[in-house]
Amino acid sequence: SSSLTINGTKMIMLSCYCPRILVYIVDHFDECLGPVVIDGTFEYDLAVIGGGSGGLACAKEAINQGARVAVLDYVTPSPQGTKWGLGGTCVNVGCIPKKLMHQAALLGESIHEAVSYGWQVPSQQAIKINWPALTEAVQNHIKSVNWVTRVDLRDKKIDYINGLGEFIDPHTIVATMKNGSKKQLTAKNVVIAVGGRPHYPDIPGAIEYCISSDDIFSLGHPPGKTLVVGAGYIGLECAGFLNSMGYPASVLVRSVPLRGFDQQMARMITNEMEERGVKFHHRCIPLSVEKLESGQLKARWMNNETQTEHEDVFDTVLMATGRYALTKQLNLPAAGVTCVNDSGKVVAATEQTNVPHIYAVGDVLEGRPELTPVAILAGRLLARRMFGGSTQQMDYDNVATTVFTPLEYGAVGLSEEVAIERHGADNIEVYHGYYKPTEFFIPQRNIKNCYLKAVTLREAPQKILGLHFVGPVAGEVIQGFAAAMKCGITMEQLVNTVGIHPTVAEEFTRLNITKRSGKDPNPASCCS
């Protein structure tokens, strides 16, 4: 026999006497000992834990820079058993299916309005959603994206490990595979990109009977009358498209809707939804959810202002009370990485954690926008800094976003409240106005919540601090203005831009009334 030292462990070679044992050790070396580390080198230059948008963007850019890369991804089923493929929240249970459901709701409205435009619709009463057909179409699209993503990793020669990764030490990760087997690997650098999952309130029946945004897009039966607990953008978007599809929706609001967004615009969103039939229960917290013999759910809640309890029966209860980072399953203490206890989020100002070679991108970051494009760009820039010699940092300011409620809300920059807090009310000017989308005229749609404003510095040339827009296709409207904000656009430049007529986006170029003036912000004419 002879000996060999690997990773500081002395191994006895028994080839003379036990050849079969030696063959087994060689064939199953990773399972027995983990990867070989020789002369301080590692199997991979980068291991990315998490196969969502940010992690994948980082991995692909690292490969482009010549790095050896592995991606570990595993989806723990939701409490209701929902699971999905590679691609993260956005592709599977977030942006993509949400936008498709939103589009389905808008199409239903358009069919009803088509009569006003001269289309002959056989029977408006017959216009209703086929929920199984919708979810099947949505899921088929998602599966196609899962497949394309997997093939892309293969073509780029990124090692994909479909296992739940956790740290053993700062450079070593073990992945637990679906069949329970283990695979170890070492990496010089690690990126944590595991994202987050919906939070469930600690009340009776929440875990057992309620669904979340993880489940709604593949729900096997029509949701029926639905209670949405939570009034963040996820809750309002879900309540909005469900109600528009003909499923009555109610929303429990604990404090304010769309916390963190401009509150004047948030009120317009909820006003519009109420006028469309969504019920809002303000200042309320859930108490319990009970399953009845009929299969329906009895929900109880308390109004914190009146201290009165209320209850109602629903077919579905959807929890949208926030999200937590999936870092607890990573065994971060073994790597020395610190995180925020309550949320599990990682503090990393430049995506670098307190352990120099371990980074984080996406929804796991404390104090950063939980948005797919943010994670993608941050991941890409991080890979360029790690392997391409770049020094460019992610700019988290002036990130545009849109809430896809029935009447959409797009925003970029500061809310009016934050602008006043930072600069003082006397140093802020707010230009605002209502407008009438041309396509709303003939079907006589409600226009009283179609509104926009520009929050600027008061001193010339009045640099724009924030732009806010409630109306149709808000995301398409606000995207171009995000680039202008990046370039430091002023109010003078905005109003001297020639608009495209007739569009809703041109309304920003027509802003000329300030809140301070007290003048009527309603439009007098569409063409002057």
Residue ranges of model-derived segments:
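Short, small-residue-biased leader/transition segments that mark boundaries at the very start
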Residues: 1-2
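Glycine-rich flavin
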Residues: 18-44, 60-222, 253-259, 263-265, ...
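Beta1/beta-strand and adjacent pyrophosphate-binding region of the FAD-binding site
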Residues: 40-52, 224-229
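Flexible, glycine-rich terminal cap/loop adjacent to redox cofactors
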Residues: 49-54, 58-84, 96, 100-106, ...
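AMP-binding/adenylate-forming core of the ANL superfamily
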Residues: 190, 315-319, 358-359, 363, ...
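Glycine-rich beta-alpha-beta "Rossmann" dinucleotide-binding loop(s) and their flanking helix/strand
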Residues: 194-215, 302-346, 364
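Rossmann-like NAD(P)H-binding beta-loop-alpha module
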Residues: 220-256, 260-261
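A conserved FAD-binding loop/helix module that cradles the flavin
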Residues: 361-418, 505-512, 516-523
